[in-house]
Amino acid sequence: TITELDQRTFLPRPLVGVGAVVWHKDHVLLIQRGKEPHAGTWSLPGGAQELGETVRDAVCREVLEETGVKISSPILVDAVDMISTNDDDKVEYHYTLIDFVAVALNPDITLGGDAADAKWVSVKEVTKYALWNKTIEVIAKSRDVLSSG
């Protein structure tokens, strides 16, 4: 049988994913990825957009599924591409990631979905989590967007 992961590799076009920088006071919500790509690494909560779902609805659903944290009115921060090639230089994964910023309506974490772990991390401690450089950029941008939004 074809696994879900197999269905996301070597596709003819990118997949759309969403992510959120969720703030609670001076902390951001990070999740430890439970699935490939990059299982075990820390990232923003998020995931795949479903057919018929708006990106804003998708990001609210994904944050809730993975962390139990409710958000509303997410604001667009940026769109970035995550492209991973194999040893033969073939594109194995290509995700177009649409990142939002939001404030937590409830800070209590209830782990679920694809996340292996989730926690509130002080913005001063974020760099200790070996995040993808684009994730660090999006977190930095999110503060500006939130303060001007």
What are the functions of these language-model segments?
Residues V22-W23, L30, A102-A104, W120:
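Conserved hydrophobic "DFG−1" position in protein kinase catalytic cores
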Residues H24-E65:
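Conserved Nudix-box catalytic region and its N-terminal flanking loop in Nudix hydrolases
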Residues V80-D108:
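Active-site-adjacent beta-strand/loop module that shapes the phosphate/pyrophosphate-binding cleft
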Residues K70-A79:
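A short coil-to-beta-strand element that immediately follows conserved catalytic motifs
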Residues D99, T110-S142:
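NUDIX/MutT-family hydrolases
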Residues T1-V21, K90:
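Acidic, metal-coordinating catalytic segment for phosphate/diphosphate chemistry
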Residues F10-P14, T41, D89-T96, A115:
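A generic structural micro-feature
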Residues A20, L76, F100-A102:
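A structural signal for short, well-ordered beta-strand segments
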